[in-house]
A protein has these predicted regions:
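Surface-exposed interaction regions that form or flank ligand-binding interfaces
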Residues: 1-79, 86-90, 115-259
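Active-site beta-strand-loop-beta-strand hairpin of nuclease catalytic cores
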Residues: 85-113
Length: 259
């Protein structure tokens, strides 16, 4: 069952596009980079969410939470693209990435991205580092349930048509195409040993269904809108943001340019 959909990021995209039209040469590269990142993120999350919803929207065994942003007390937000909560109290964190021209993973575990016209791929931060951060923050949020040491599996999902150059030595099994993740999901969750499932269930109160857990995590959600606008000196409801949004660019154009 779907407990939370993706946040609507299009108002922020529209504001940034209007800002881009008004920006001077010193600000344009920053805004263009932010828009590229947002477009790619929206495209990847939307594609993965559609696939997840198609298979799990009617499930009574798995709760689905899209686009969950948790901010711990010490700061430093964790953006979880997709969280799956199985009835066995097993959790899946799915990090979606969009690479239009392909991804290379080296034998040392480094990630490199191909760009249009590039002769060599460029290095990017490891998504595994992001996932490790997300797991840590999620475990803190799960502590009130007695589930801070529950099994948490992590996967990096790419578009079904993505080109992946895999290494021979480094284990890249956690990087897969979005249309392949259900096989991993079914093998990992529904075939869990009975003693493991019972042990996880016994650590939670009977009243804490997967829906209860999902809803309590959703109550901790803090949207990223304010942070995005603040990087450009705007408040979400301030006069500058409203002025930039007066003549927003078409929404379709904001996504169609995803790279």
């Amino acid at each position: 069952m779907i407990y939370k959909d993706n946040d609507n990021k299009m108002p922020v995209v529209a504001i940034l596009m209007r800002m881009l039209a008004l920006a001077g040469p010193d600000k344009r590269p920053l805004i263009e980079r932010e828009l590229r990142m947002m477009r790619a993120g929206i495209a990847a999350e939307r594609e993965a969410a559609a696939l997840i919803d198609m298979y799990l929207k009617d499930s009574t065994r798995t709760a689905v939470v899209h686009d969950l942003r948790l901010v711990p007390n010490e700061g430093g937000a964790a953006q979880i693209d997709h969280l799956l909560i199985h009835r066995s109290r097993r959790f899946y964190l799915l990090d979606t990435r969009h690479f239009s021209y392909g991804l290379r993973i080296t034998d040392d575990g480094d990630f490199l991205r191909w760009s249009e016209g590039a002769k060599q791929p460029e290095p990017i931060p490891s998504p595994f580092d992001d996932l490790a951060r997300q797991v840590s923050v999620l475990r803190d949020a799960l502590e009130p349930f007695g589930l801070d040491d529950a099994p948490v599996d992590t996967l990096v999902l790419l578009a079904p048509n993505a080109r992946i150059e895999r290494p021979r030595r480094f284990d890249s099994a956690r990087v897969m195409k979005a249309d392949q993740f259900l096989e991993r999901l079914n093998n990992g969750l529904d075939n869990a040993p009975a003693l493991t499932v019972l042990g996880n269930l016994n650590r939670t109160r009977m009243s804490d269904s997967i829906g209860d857990i999902a809803n309590r995590l959703i109550a901790l959600h803090r949207p990223s809108t304010a942070d995005t606008l603040a990087r450009f000196g705007l408040g979400r409801h301030g006069p500058q943001a409203r002025a930039c949004a007066d003549e927003p660019a078409p929404v379709g154009a904001a996504i169609d340019g995803a790279q």
